[in-house]
């Protein structure tokens, strides 16, 4: 049931946090935004509400699988560690056991999420300005003005990617399989230690918030533990998240970065060390409600099934 509960929790989390995720990605990849509110105002003015939901369909379709694998891997890994070390899956795991299982959960996610992350970032950073710039570049290169079949076509330039699946196909055709796994090195570094932090902090907070005489926390305890675990995980994940987003967005025009280290050095040299923490406040603000919902849904499904089976 860990897989089913994780899938339901993941879908609930995406529904809550996607608009702020779009804002976060744009702040991290586009220097024109002075801050969170500037990005929100500019996105709404140019693209209205739909601009905050660009690329949503693919995460919704895949998040159930990814979240299911994350929670399932964590609990199965933890069970195997406890059986190997203590002879029983019911033994209380140590903090090191939880950390190792959480890290394994994060690393497994990368193979599933990298292509969808590339599509999500490309669609989220595909603005009207970029579309217009690409049209102008094509006109300049050809030496002739772009011909518009209709006045509407000139006013509304066609975006490069028409949707998540089209984006994946286009990236694979233009950049090969490596294009779909662009930024996966940064994603590995982000997911490994952030999910170790995520599950360890949740387990510790649940233990602290469990009332005396009870075996598990109440709903309020789960809400607080889940929200705080999400904030702590994103606090340690943000530097690599910035690099990951820049590497994955680096395919909509000139290729600026040769790899992970070059992206880190170039970003810090041009924008200072603070660039690695772009979107940190937004990540933390988004993480609290999203992970409250994820863990409440997850725990609710587990407790419901346990009550039905006993």
From Swiss-Prot:
It is found in: Mitochondrion inner membrane; Mitochondrion outer membrane. Keywords: Membrane, Mitochondrion, Mitochondrion inner membrane, Mitochondrion outer membrane, Repeat, Transmembrane, Transmembrane helix, Transport. Solcar repeats lie at residues 1-80, 93-208, 217-304. It catalyses: NAD(+)(in) = NAD(+)(out); acetyl-CoA(in) = acetyl-CoA(out). The chain crosses the membrane at residues 3-23, 55-75, 98-114, 194-210, 219-239, 280-298. Specifically expressed in liver (at protein level). The keyword Transmembrane helix applies. Signal peptide: none annotated. Its main location: mitochondrion. The keyword Transmembrane helix applies. It is a multi-pass membrane protein. SLC25A47 is transcriptionally up-regulated in response to antihyperglycemic drug metformin. Promotes metformin pharmacological effects. Belongs to the mitochondrial carrier (TC 2.A.29) family. This is Solute carrier family 25 member 47. The lineage of its organism: Eukaryota, Metazoa, Chordata, Craniata, Vertebrata.
